[in-house]
């Protein structure tokens, strides 16, 4: 979902999904370069004044996940290609308790080192999408299988390493 009118504008849709045992993903920091100026813009008013738009989206999504045992059902889209933008955005994926959908690996240029940078300290909640990367190895079934196995191993190892990293970002308790 795209929160162009503010993350709270999605509240009705999010509540409908949650009330029906479903979940949603909200774009926060995407792999699309065109979105960077909007996502990293500093909010001029409202609850998250002085923070980035992406931070406000992530914080609002996290509020829907509070009180859940285990992983929440409101997720974020955080692109694997954003690299060091993650530091400038104020968004800390390691503090997020919902699923994180991460496009951009392979086909759009993200590599394992990018996963380790962006998802440092996460706790097994990152879903890396690789469909275009794998499809590029087709139509040969053996090549598709080999690409799938190879990329799965690479991503698994990168996310394990990211999970073991300690993030330097510390948020105030009320911001978590």
Model-derived regions: residue spans:
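A C-terminal functional module that forms or caps the active site or interfaces directly
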Residues: 76, 80-129, 133-137
């Amino acid at each position: 979902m795209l929160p162009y009118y503010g993350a709270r504008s999605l509240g009705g849709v999010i509540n409908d999904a949650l009330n029906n045992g479903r979940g949603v993903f909200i774009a926060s920091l995407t792999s699309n370069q065109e979105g960077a100026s909007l996502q990293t813009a500093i909010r001029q008013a409202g609850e998250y004044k002085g923070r980035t738009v992406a931070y406000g989206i992530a914080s609002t999504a996290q509020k829907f996940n509070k009180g859940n045992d285990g992983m929440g059902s409101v997720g974020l889209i955080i692109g694997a290609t954003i690299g060091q933008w993650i530091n400038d955005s104020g968004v800390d994926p390691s503090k997020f308790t919902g699923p994180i959908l991460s496009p951009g690996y392979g086909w759009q240029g993200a590599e394992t080192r990018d996963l380790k940078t962006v998802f440092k300290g996460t706790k097994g909640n990152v879903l890396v999408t690789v469909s275009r990367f794998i499809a590029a190895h087709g139509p040969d079934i053996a090549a598709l299988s080999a690409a799938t196995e190879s990329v799965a191993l690479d991503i698994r190892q990168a996310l394990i390493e990211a999970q073991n990293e300690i993030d330097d970002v510390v948020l105030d308790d009320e911001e978590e």
